[in-house]
């Protein structure tokens, strides 16, 4: 009975406290009597070896497909400009019209176009073809002022949302990012009644 009790306690002790190797400052200590000076020398030697190895090159895993947050440092450049310095194309897509304003990063107006200024009248202003034509016209005016890349900010739920972006790319502008800035009420004003067809 005593032998069984001793072997059981040995199993419990070996399971609870597994044997470990003595490691001090990343260097295994061969004996307990190793002097402090030898341990410091071994740790210093290891630090020198780590410092001599070159830093690894940035990997593809650190690259992000998403544009940087304004104010965040990034190495990405478009035509030599940072993300915050790229002009912005504001698209307001209502159900009756689509308006496009291209402004500089400092919010100075560069180009403006809408479906009405492109010759569409009445109900035709609210179509996708009219929005695409307005996008091409706004892109042509902006490229005439030296704009090559734009950030797009879309507001509204009209039928010309995507057509206007397509028109900007067809007009020669390269779209860097698309932001949806549509206002969403948190149960604000009462909406208009539904149409009966």
UniProtKB/Swiss-Prot annotation:
Entry-linked SUPFAM superfamilies: Translational machinery components (SSF53137)
GO biological process: mitochondrial translation; peptide biosynthetic process; translation
Main localization (coarse): mitochondrion
InterPro entries in the record: Ribosomal_uS11 (IPR001971), Ribosomal_uS11_CS (IPR018102), Ribosomal_uS11_sf (IPR036967)
Subcellular location, record wording: Mitochondrion
Highest taxon of the lineage: Eukaryota
Keyword field: Mitochondrion, Ribonucleoprotein, Ribosomal protein, Transit peptide
Keyword set includes Mitochondrion: yes
GO CC terms, sorted: mitochondrial inner membrane; mitochondrial small ribosomal subunit
Residue numbers spanned by region Disordered: 43-66
Biased composition (Basic and acidic residues): 43-52
KW Transport (keyword) present: no
S-S bridge residues: none
GO MF annotation list: structural constituent of ribosome
Subunit structure: Component of the mitochondrial ribosome small subunit (28S) which comprises a 12S rRNA and about 30 distinct proteins.
PANTHER family: 40S RIBOSOMAL PROTEIN S14/30S RIBOSOMAL PROTEIN S11
Annotated HAMAP family: Ribosomal_uS11
Protein family according to the UniProt entry: Belongs to the universal ribosomal protein uS11 family.
Name under which the protein is recorded: Small ribosomal subunit protein uS11m
Provenance organism: Bos taurus
Lineage of producing organism: Eukaryota, Metazoa, Chordata, Craniata, Vertebrata
Gene name as annotated: MRPS11
